[in-house]
Amino acid sequence: MGRLISVSFGLLVVFLSLSGTGADQDCLPGWSFYEGHCYKVFNVKKTWEDAEKFCQKQSNGKHLATIEWLGKANFVADLVTLMNSDPDLDWIGLRVEDKRQQCSSHWTDGSAVSYENVVHNTKCFGLDQKTGYRTWVALRCELAYHFICMSRVPRGA
């Protein structure tokens, strides 16, 4: 029981820090502010490409979330943990799409990879609930998951 109260209190603190800063007034309702950007978790499932298009339609300058440093990674992980209604995987705005790209790995017999046969040769990335949304996982782009959109705070806001 004590652990449940501790976890509940911890989530309350995270929620208040995400939604009660006053700076989030620069974001649209339902969006959370962090370091000059607004973020929102969408609890509908879409493919990576459809999620990116959906984010772009929300407003000019919106995209799937970009995670450029540890502080932002922690913020996004906490936001997804709090706002995701169906914990699983969530798309972020990272995709590898170079048809000439070769893996730098090795096969189990030690030979170098000189050929790659990946479906659509495209890898999209998401956050995994199993790691508290703190690690990126390569996923098939055509699968549908929840996603996080991000936008810059408008100048002068």
UniProtKB/Swiss-Prot annotation:
<keyword id="KW-0800">Toxin</keyword>
<comment type="similarity">
    <text>Belongs to the snaclec family.</text>
</comment>
<dbReference type="GO" id="GO:0090729">
    <property type="term" value="F:toxin activity"/>
</dbReference>
<dbReference type="InterPro" id="IPR001304">
    <property type="entry name" value="C-type_lectin-like"/>
</dbReference>
<dbReference type="GO" id="GO:0005576">
    <property type="term" value="C:extracellular region"/>
</dbReference>
<feature type="disulfide bond">
    <location>
        <begin position="27"/>
        <end position="38"/>
    </location>
</feature>
<feature type="domain" description="C-type lectin">
    <location>
        <begin position="34"/>
        <end position="150"/>
    </location>
</feature>
<keyword id="KW-0732">Signal</keyword>
<keyword id="KW-1199">Hemostasis impairing toxin</keyword>
<feature type="disulfide bond">
    <location>
        <begin position="124"/>
        <end position="141"/>
    </location>
</feature>
<keyword id="KW-1015">Disulfide bond</keyword>
<comment type="subunit">
    <text>Heterodimer; disulfide-linked.</text>
</comment>
<keyword id="KW-0964">Secreted</keyword>
<dbReference type="Pfam" id="PF00059">
    <property type="entry name" value="Lectin_C"/>
</dbReference>
<comment type="function">
    <text>Interferes with one step of hemostasis (modulation of platelet aggregation, or coagulation cascade, for example).</text>
</comment>
<dbReference type="InterPro" id="IPR050111">
    <property type="entry name" value="C-type_lectin/snaclec_domain"/>
</dbReference>
<feature type="disulfide bond">
    <location>
        <begin position="55"/>
        <end position="149"/>
    </location>
</feature>
<dbReference type="InterPro" id="IPR016187">
    <property type="entry name" value="CTDL_fold"/>
</dbReference>
<protein>
    <recommendedName>
        <fullName>Snaclec A16</fullName>
    </recommendedName>
</protein>
<dbReference type="InterPro" id="IPR016186">
    <property type="entry name" value="C-type_lectin-like/link_sf"/>
</dbReference>
<feature type="signal peptide">
    <location>
        <begin position="1"/>
        <end position="23"/>
    </location>
</feature>
